Regions:
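Catalytic cores of alpha/beta
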Residues: 362-377, 406-418, 449-454, 458-459, ...
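Short, small-residue alpha-helix embedded
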Residues: 20, 25, 148-149, 210-234, ...
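Short glycine/threonine-rich catalytic loop with a Thr-x-Gly-x-Asp
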Residues: 13-16, 205-224, 461, 488
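Hydrophobic faces of well-ordered beta-strands that scaffold small-molecule active sites
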Residues: 33, 106-108, 140, 307-315, ...
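Alpha-helix-loop-beta-strand connector modules within alpha/beta enzyme cores
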Residues: 345-366, 383, 391-406, 438-466, ...
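Glycine-rich phosphate-binding active-site loops on the catalytic face of alpha/beta enzymes
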Residues: 36-42, 255, 335-336, 383-391, ...
Length: 506
């Protein structure tokens, strides 16, 4: 069944913001949007001419109709015109969270001022928001002006952004996304911030030069809501929302005499529309004065790989390395997780020797020091290793670097390093590693491949067996990595033949 997302917000007669923008954005991400209208605005591209709040009785009737038949996975809230509306919505949300079998995620975009500068509330609602609504909100998505209105913190630099986010959290909000469209720092760039589960995420991209920005805030929060309803983690929803808005700004047009609306396109398919993940040591990180940890060693642009990796066997012993190479598996990875194994260095050296003997590509998982020492073809690292591995040493040694990614945020983070290949997973649940909350599935893989395939060889990994391998290969991914499909097969040799046939490897 299609995911249902509600928008509790105002109507924009000009069609650029409010529930009109919400529904377009939700549709672009394949979810069904429902609405409860809080206000009817008379507006066009030049501004808001009047604001007409809907009575609480009519709002409640809309909510009761929806909840009786079409409960939401996520509820996005936009313009609330007065204190009575805030109190009513808070009462309903409290009941949903207490009684629904699957309590909804609440995304709140605190719309107070239109792009044109016109006020969008009948009265000062800040105190009522802090008292009644914010303690129920899972994700709040204010812009610069709305952040300052709610917190009293003026966003004059990164530390002020962090301070404002913590102030919002103190009101009971669970996670914060602060939109940087009005914060021109560094000049010519749009910097956005997210705080979620004790971690911060910064995104940046060059500002899109267009005056047609009406509805960007509504649309971004609606994309985040749609993605959350489909199981994306917030950091990925944040990324996709930004990419969608960037694409929409590039395609935006004028329909009247004033500011045009952001365009609504589709799932963002061009890497040029995606923001950069800002990290310590990067140019934007330096501009924002991010502290660089002592152990952090940034490097980018690793040795390339010719062609695709094909069937990729990930195994934990030298014997399995030899069996795979003997049976014409051209890419293998030695994954020994026991760093205290007394034969660790011996096994790594032998695996590299076998790779040279059979003409195969042998990647060493994690143990980059020994991989350098013994001249491995390459190293495979996880995201957590990027903070501690000596990436310059790996690059200077000429080793190829493969990186694991689990979703779109990690994909873009890995892209900063320009590795030799990118692995995306886990595609399916797997018993070889705890991937709770990180199962990607075929739908996400189908989006990942066209984004990255022109940049790097791509690898799909996680829970892939013979029965699943052909549908994984059909996404266009360049390599299919397997573990148990070979090591637990009755005949590993025949399993290799069958797998290569299934993925179309000659």
């Amino acid at each position: 069944m299609s995911k249902v997302v509600w928008s509790i917000a105002g109507s924009d007669s000009g069609g650029g913001a409010g529930v009109q923008a919400d529904l377009k954005a939700m549709h672009s991400f394949g979810v069904h949007g429902c609405t409860a209208i809080t206000a009817l605005t008379a507006q066009n591209s030049l501004g808001v001419e009047s604001l007409n709040a809907v009575s609480t009785e009519v709002i409640e009737a809309q909510l009761l109709a929806l909840e009786s038949d079409m409960p939401a996975a996520v509820i996005k809230i936009g313009m609330l015109a007065n204190v009575q509306q805030i109190q009513l919505i808070a009462e309903h949300l409290t009941r949903y969270k207490a009684r629904w079998e699957m309590p909804p995620v609440i995304v709140y975009d605190p719309v107070a001022i239109a792009t044109s500068g016109d006020a969008l509330t009948e009265e000062d609602t800040v105190d009522a928001l802090k008292t009644h609504l914010l303690p129920l909100v899972d994700v709040i998505t204010p812009n610069t002006h709305e952040t300052q209105l709610l917190t009293g913190v003026y966003l004059i630099g990164p530390d002020a952004v962090r301070e404002a986010a913590q102030k919002l959290l103190s009101f009971g909000v669970k996670s914060v996304v602060i939109k940087g469209g009005h914060w021109d720092y560094p000049k010519g760039y749009c910097i956005d911030y997210c705080w979620h589960q004790e971690a911060e995420y910064w995104l940046g991209n060059e500002s899109v030069n267009t005056p047609h920005t009406h509805g960007t805030g509504c649309s971004l929060s609606s994309v985040i809501a749609a993605c959350l309803s489909k199981g994306y983690p917030l950091k990925d929803a944040f990324i996709l929302g930004k990419a969608y808005i960037n694409a929409g700004l590039k395609a935006a047009k004028r329909y009247g005499e004033g500011i045009g609306p952001v365009a609504h396109t589709h799932f963002p398919e061009s890497i040029a529309d995606y923001p950069q993940v800002i990290e310590p040591g990067s140019w934007l990180g330096d501009e924002l004065e991010f502290l660089v940890p002592d152990e952090y060693n940034y490097a980018a642009g690793f040795a390339p790989i010719e062609g695709e990796l094909g069937l990729y066997a990930v195994v934990d012993t030298v014997d399995w390395i030899e069996l795979c190479l003997k049976n014409d598996v051209k890419t293998v990875q030695l994954r020994i997780k026991d760093a205290d194994s007394p034969t660790l260095e011996q096994d790594i050296a032998k695996a590299i020797e076998l790779g040279n003997k059979y003409g195969g590509r042998v990647f060493i998982n994690d143990h980059w020091q020994l991989a350098i020492k013994h001249g491995a073809y390459g190293v495979h690292l996880g995201q957590e290793d990027l903070n501690v591995a000596d990436l310059n040493a790996i690059k200077q040694a000429g080793l190829r670097l493969g990186l694991s990614t689990h979703g779109f945020y990690e994909m873009l983070r890995a892209h900063n390093y320009r590795p030799s290949y990118l692995a995306f997973g886990a595609i399916y649940p797997t018993t070889t590693k705890d991937m709770t909350g990180q199962i990607q599935g075929l739908e996400k893989l189908r989006h990942f491949v066209p984004l990255m395939h022109a940049e790097y060889p791509t690898v799909a990994i996680g829970g892939i067996d013979l029965a699943r391998s052909s549908e994984v290969a059909a996404t266009g991914v360049g390599s299919v990595a397997v573990v148990r499909a070979i090591t637990e097969a009755q005949s590993p040799e025949q399993a290799i033949i069958n797998l290569k046939q299934a993925i179309g490897e000659q």
